[in-house]
């Protein structure tokens, strides 16, 4: 089977979050199932700089008003189709925002162009390769099934994965002519959304199957609390909705082979984590004592619960804990966390921005990772924590609920606990969870058992890839 995947970011070419990890790892996990995937991605400067020996496969003289070329290239064992459209993607900022952190005003056009290019490839316009199915990710490529639905060519089966329904790609109605869709596409059954244009909403209406990244989140987005205004649309497609938990790429996230950490180790050599811990201590300027180091690797936003963490930093320090924080996001939250580091030198350290190598080192050297998200479709950092023996402390929501076994009395007695869950998602709830963690950490036998149990957990893509392969097969055999 041949699959066209369309994503606005893919690791290792370009990454701003977990979407890139998933889009980068799933194709390889599907290979053993006889599924050949080519991934269409925008030609951002960071992408164009690293690709080698690109082969031009498709030319667009007028892709929503601009010239573009699709290049095929092999990189890191994956097959990519890179949409080189300098007018859209050759920007000095990031994939979605400029150097000042503001959304590009033409994001609608940039990602509609990506979607239209995907629909053209799906329609057989790229010589020598015809996909059997299209898999798109989030709002940035959600118009692919919309363009296919309204095209004169036969429609391919399509899958839309919702990684985070909070990001919907909503724009004013004035952009509609620029999308070059027929007039009747601007309707409740199409992309119209309360008078505006909804990219994700259009994809939800037209994709043949919908997936999201955990079973719990699939249920949550059917409710007003988590559906972000789209719960009605999703409820109307509930029979086509599947919750499939993400996995991690064991070739990249493996403490036994990881080149980004100071000392590799396994479940039988946990003492070697001390070398990594020492480097974390040095990087963040922390006191080198026996107290637990709690780490955070996250966007610093309200959704991620970073305001809760900032509000209890003094209490964590008073209990003997230390904090190592890596991330960027809301300026006020960044300021609050840096202020905490200033008040508690040697106990709280903050490193602004995102650093892939440092994120690996923190998982390999810290004792626990804190993930207090108010909602979390799946989450990957808790899976990395399991794999690296960095015990997850998580809010009981979404994929965090599906992937972590809470250290309650029964789970500890049965030796199956892998982390600590808390609810409600409040500052007091988080503080109680950290208090439990510090209590358990004092019994090194219990803590080590939790680490080893987490490291034994199957967090690979194996089972999830089987579910995707089965879904693809059903759709292709049924036809669009």
Curated annotation (Swiss-Prot):
Its EC number is 2.4.1.21. It catalyses: [(1->4)-alpha-D-glucosyl](n) + ADP-alpha-D-glucose = [(1->4)-alpha-D-glucosyl](n+1) + ADP + H(+). It is an enzyme of class 2 (transferase). It comes from the Bacteria. One of its GO terms (molecular function) is alpha-1,4-glucan glucosyltransferase (ADP-glucose donor) activity. NCBIfam families: glgA, PRK00654.1-2. This is Glycogen synthase. It comes from Rhizobium rhizogenes (strain K84 / ATCC BAA-868) (Agrobacterium radiobacter).
């Amino acid at each position: 089977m041949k699959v066209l995947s369309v994503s606005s970011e893919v690791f290792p070419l370009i990454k701003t979050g977990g979407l890139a990890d998933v889009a980068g790892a799933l194709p390889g996990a599907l290979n053993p199932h006889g599924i050949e995937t080519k991934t269409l991605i925008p030609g951002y400067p960071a992408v164009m700089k690293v690709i080698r020996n690109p082969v031009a496969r498709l030319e667009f003289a007028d892709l929503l008003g601009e010239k573009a070329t699709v290049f095929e290239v092999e990189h890191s064992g994956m097959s990519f189709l890179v949409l080189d459209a300098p007018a859209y993607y050759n920007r000095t900022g990031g994939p979605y925002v400029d150097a000042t952190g503001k959304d590009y005003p033409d994001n609608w056009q940039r990602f509609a162009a990506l979607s239209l290019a995907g629909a053209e490839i799906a329609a057989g316009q790229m010589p020598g390769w015809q996909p059997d199915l299209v898999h798109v990710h989030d709002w940035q490529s959600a118009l692919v099934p919309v363009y296919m639905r309204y095209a004169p060519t036969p429609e391919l089966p399509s899958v839309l994965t919702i990684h985070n329904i909070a990001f919907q790609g909503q724009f004013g109605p004035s952009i509609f002519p620029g999308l070059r869709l027929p007039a009747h596409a601007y309707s409740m059954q199409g992309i119209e959304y309360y008078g505006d244009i909804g990219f994700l909403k259009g994809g939800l209406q037209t994709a043949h199957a919908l997936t999201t990244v955990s079973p719990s989140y699939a249920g949550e987005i059917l409710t007003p609390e988590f559906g972000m205004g789209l719960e009605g649309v999703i409820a109307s497609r509930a029979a086509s909705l599947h919750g499939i938990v993400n996995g991690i790429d064991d070739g990249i996230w493996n403490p036994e082979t990881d080149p980004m950490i100071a000392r590799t180790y396994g479940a039988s050599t946990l003492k070697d984590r001390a070398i990594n811990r020492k480097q974390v201590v040095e990087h963040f300027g922390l006191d080198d004592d026996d107290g637990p180091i709690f780490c955070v690797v996250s966007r610093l936003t309200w959704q991620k619960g970073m305001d809760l963490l900032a509000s209890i930093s003094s209490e964590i320090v008073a209990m003997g804990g230390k904090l190592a924080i890596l991330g960027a996001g809301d300026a006020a939250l960044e300021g609050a966390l840096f202020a905490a580091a200033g008040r508690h030198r040697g106990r709280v350290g903050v490193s602004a921005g995102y650093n892939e190598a440092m994120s690996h080192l923190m998982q390999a050297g810290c004792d626990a990772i804190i993930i207090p998200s108010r909602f979390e479709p799946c989450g990957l950092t808790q899976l990395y924590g399991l794999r690296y023996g960095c015990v997850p402390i998580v809010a009981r929501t979404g994929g965090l609920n599906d992937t972590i076994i809470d250290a309650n009395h029964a789970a500890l007695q049965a030796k199956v606990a892998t982390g600590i869950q808390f609810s409600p998602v409040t500052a007091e709830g988080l503080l109680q969870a950290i208090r439990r963690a510090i209590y358990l950490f004092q019994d090194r036998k219990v803590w080590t058992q939790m680490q080893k149990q987490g490291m034994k957990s199957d967090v690979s893509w194996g089972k999830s890839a089987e579910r995707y392969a089965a879904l693809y097969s059903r759709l292709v055999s049924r036809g669009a």
